[in-house]
Amino acid sequence: MKSIQIRTSEVARVAAKNIVINGSDTITAVAKSAELQALKASLMRGQIKTWLYKKVNGKIRQCTGTLFNSLVKSMTVGGHTPKKVFGQFAYIEIFSDGHCEWRSFREENFIGTIEN
């Protein structure tokens, strides 16, 4: 299996947002940002992962999702990922009953991954 490659410019960008918006210390901000980029790379390789993030209303949300290529293509209209807004992390959430929906959250609200 190929190693996961993380773009350092993305890590720095998200870490800076975490420091400014959430008042995080540098080490925590960089660690969360690197973990988010590793999560994205894993999801794009077809893995299904579970993670936590803070919703806009302050509640903590646990979700399970993927960015598996064929699933993304089947759920995309017009060739663009829904909610593709700078600063948002868009993903396909997989529910226990098998149905899937597009979701997104603010990058700076990422808490961490949960081992599956």
Where are these regions (language model features)?
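Structured surface patches comprising rigid loops and adjacent beta-strands/short helices at the edges
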Residues: 72, 98-116
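Eukaryotic low-complexity, non-globular regulatory regions
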Residues: 1-19
